[in-house]
Amino acid sequence: MINTIKQDAKNRMEKTLSVYLSDVDGIRTGRARASVLDGIVVETYGGRVKLNTISSISVSDNKTLLVKVWEINNVGAIKTAIINSNLGFGFSCEGAVIRLTVPDMTQDMRKNLVKLLGKISEDCRISIRNIRRDIMDKLKIMQDNKDISEDDLRIAGVEIQKITDEIIKKINDTFLAKEKELLHV
């Protein structure tokens, strides 16, 4: 029973970490990365589809992304979606290929992105600690109901804290690496 609760805690924390990592990966750093376009949704085929489902996205060089559109009649809709995304990319079209140029980032932009990164990181840490608190509350209720002993509660608490510390270390390491990438000119 305790192992199930510990596994639940680990799963919930890892899902939170996964969402955090995808959020951090979406932050622009001044270098061309295909993942920056992951959130772009295109109005086509009478609905909304993700850009990467109707085209292939690749990195040409440090400042250029290539979007190879699979059906040329989608080029206009993709251009509109990129413009509406407010990513600030310059672009040119050559048939079914859209070339996106990543603009240089100003120091102010970099500082604002570091602040955003810090906020996202802190929100994730808070979520992880809330998961730990919820799990510990469940364990305390179990101990109050005499389902587990006080020793079991203490041992489980230490193990839950160990899992929490590992996840928060990953968050901190990711934050520091991304901060270094953002501030590197």
Curated annotation (Swiss-Prot):
Provide any one GO MF term from the record.
Answer: ribosomal large subunit binding
- Name the major location: cytoplasm
User: Per the record's keyword annotation, is Cytoplasm included, yes or no?
Assistant: yes
Q: Where in the cell is it found?
A: Cytoplasm
Q: Sorted alphabetically, which keywords does the UniProt record give?
A: Cytoplasm, Protein biosynthesis
Q: Name one GO cellular component term.
A: cytoplasm
Pfam entry (one): RRF
List GO BP terms, alphabetically: translational termination
Could you tell me what this protein does? Answer: Responsible for the release of ribosomes from messenger RNA at the termination of protein biosynthesis. May increase the efficiency of translation by recycling ribosomes from one round of translation to another.
Name the NCBIfam families on file: frr
Q: Which HAMAP family match?
A: RRF
Family, per entry: Belongs to the RRF family.
Q: What protein name is recorded for this chain?
A: Ribosome-recycling factor
Provide the species name.
Ehrlichia ruminantium (strain Welgevonden)
Cite the source lineage.
Bacteria, Pseudomonadati, Pseudomonadota, Alphaproteobacteria, Rickettsiales
